[in-house]
Amino acid sequence: MTKFWKRSRVTKALTDGGRAGSFEEAEARLNKVRVDVVLGDDQLATAAGQAAALTAVATARKCFGRVTLVMAGDAPLITILPIGETVKAAARRLGARVDTHASKLATHTIRIGNTPAGARWNVRCWWDRWLAGTRAFDDDRIGDSRLSVSGVFAGAVAVRQVFACVLAGRDIPVRDATVSLWTSWQRASMDEIGPERFDVPDKLWLLGLGHLGQAFVWTLCFLRGEGERLVVLQDNQKISEENEATSLLVLPGDEQLGEKKVRVADVWLKQAGWETSLIERRHVGDVALGDDDPPILLSGLDRLKPRLVLAKHGFPFMIDAGIGHGAGDFEGIQMRTIVNGKPPAGLWSEPAKAEEIEDGTKGLLDRPAYLELEQHVGECGKVSFAEASVAVPFVGAATGAIVIGQAIRLATLEPAPVFLQMELGAPDMATLGGLTEAPHSNLGSFSMRL
């Protein structure tokens, strides 16, 4: 449509929030950011270290247009990914520049492991098994680094803190944050780092393979697996230009444009050792469930109506993830768990009425950024921009880590949140709306011992 369309879902966080007077200004603000992701030798060959580095690289590159991975050596990837056999090769395929020394031009540094302070603004990724987050200083040493899910979350939150500086128009202090991905609704205790041994689902049904669905796949692929494992992938859409900036599996370049999203996800999962079954059509509640079908559905759909249909479809467990769509709530994460197709009353708010959505769109059209945009794309193009939601890749990545963590809880026969709400700006202050009953029987899983 226009050069501004490709990254529009990200730049709308600035234009729609009144933080930039034009889409051109918003892109210029993002392009000024130069992130160094510095990976220390002590974390180079760990599951969490590799996941954090590549998540930070992928999400920073999508937000800011460039990123540098700084590392003294190299190491084979612990899991098999379709982007290379080593950390260095994978980072380059994700669009990063790789160097052995920090850049003097870096504006922000994300540090992973024992590394020297870099740019004037630094944030450290931190974790200890199921605990994950960020630190401003070196007081807390990284703990157990064998769980990749924690690395994914920490890398995403670190990039979120860089993005917060762009929104504020200045560098803001780094915020210490700690979340337990095992019990995300509780205030994290440094003495409770979660289990060393747990079960991982070996059968999953993933519905919706856009921003959130691809984040589920991303996190799954970083988990080591064994034995026969199956994922049913369902989506009817194709990769389009704006997906590169928001979706973790869409790589730099135009090679994937026009491909079905299920086929892109299929490549990643097969490489990681999963068997796949593809359904390239929408699920409107008409697909009968068989005894051999996956008992856990992970839903990453945008629209509420199909989610409500699926909530009553009868999956033994459905984990539904949703995120905010506007400039004021795009960092908000909601997760719901529905048991046996019986969602509790009031689990979802009433959907916005059509006239309310239309009023919100009209409210954007008169803003300076959209009036200036009209000169480039015309009236129809301006409306298309206004109707699109705000979406940033680090929110998807963080959501993927939370959802996969809770799917693992279910497979381990532990209860999961009926409703969980988290704001990524303050992830350690999540709220809980009750817990499901623990599963009464094995859902199909393989045991993992760190």
Label each region the model flagged.
Residues 1-450:
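Adenine nucleotide-associated cytosolic modules
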